């Protein structure tokens, strides 16, 4: 019984490795949600190859930034153009969920609901572990 579970376990591990290694995104969203377009890259190294072909280095000016548009304190003066060396990192949310129509209270970590996520995980993983041992 125990010897037959080893090939199945290895097959599951190998299939998970294949799933994770080939499930990366090759389509990137550029700009904000209003003025956006998608860029497709044929491989994971396409962006690195593009950068090495154009030989970009630190402090290269890709486009000129006005002083009024720049909201940072650190600037360097290179030949008449301002080059932004540091900007605050503001990322838009990847997923925007609609608000709930009902006046439901917000979930909290205190009270009776604390720890239920671990119990659900334990309840789902224990039968799977027992199944793999049984094989």
From Swiss-Prot:
Invasion zone and early symbiotic zone. Residues 1-23 form the signal peptide. Keywords: Nodulation, Signal. GO terms for biological process: nodulation. Involved in the infection process during the plant-rhizobium interaction. This is Early nodulin-5. It comes from Pisum sativum (Garden pea).
């Amino acid at each position: 019984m125990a010897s037959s579970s080893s090939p199945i376990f290895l097959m599951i591990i190998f299939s998970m490795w294949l799933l994770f290694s080939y499930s990366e995104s090759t389509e990137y969203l550029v700009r904000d949600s209003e003025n956006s377009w998608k860029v497709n890259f044929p491989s994971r190294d396409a962006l690195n190859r593009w950068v090495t072909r154009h030989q970009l280095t630190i402090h290269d000016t890709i486009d000129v930034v006005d002083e009024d548009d720049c909201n940072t304190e650190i600037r360097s003066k290179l030949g008449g153009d301002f080059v932004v060396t540091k900007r605050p990192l503001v990322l838009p949310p990847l997923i925007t969920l609609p608000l709930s129509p009902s006046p439901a209270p917000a979930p909290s970590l205190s009270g009776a609901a604390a720890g239920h996520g671990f119990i659900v995980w334990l309840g789902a993983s224990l039968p799977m572990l027992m199944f793999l041992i049984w094989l």
